[in-house]
A protein has these predicted regions:
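Enzymes that bind and transform nitrogen-containing heteroaromatic metabolites
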Residues: 1-136
Length: 136
């Protein structure tokens, strides 16, 4: 409840998605002004297609997702990605146990993977932003 997102939800519309149907867990967030979207469950997680349907019904037709590798994989797997932003910085990170941008099982072959076309390159001092749009 201490996060800035929750604290400002009366001024800035804030939607929280969950597959938890226990309304007593929702009410503290609702008291701060958050709107709760209860989705179907898929493999113990939010059903992303159901969430997208609910967001569309309230007029939200695009999202900027800064997710971890698991969420990124789930969105790709469900064909819910049409644009990717990839930032490259001037520092080298990594290691054998480092998380990657896309986790999950991955695609078996390049033909199974969605294809993206480079649409923009921007430089910010020592960093680069690559933007890709899905090829349909």
């Amino acid at each position: 409840m201490n996060s800035k997102i929750v604290q400002t939800s009366k001024e800035i519309p804030t939607y929280l998605a969950t597959c938890c149907t226990n309304k007593s867990k929702h009410s503290p967030y609702e008291m701060y002004g958050c709107s709760i979207l209860v989705t179907k469950q898929q493999n113990g997680h939010i059903d992303l297609n159901d969430l997208m349907q609910q967001l569309g019904k309230i007029g939200i037709d695009s999202l900027f997702v800064e997710g971890g590798g698991t969420l990124n994989w789930s969105l790709l797997q469900e064909n819910l990605v049409n644009h990717i932003q990839c930032y490259i910085g001037n520092k080298v990170l990594g290691g054998q146990s480092a998380k990657t941008a896309i986790l999950g099982t991955g695609f078996d072959t390049p033909n199974d993977s969605p294809a993206f076309k480079l649409s923009n390159i921007m430089c910010f001092d020592e960093d680069i932003l690559l933007e890709y749009d899905i090829i349909t």
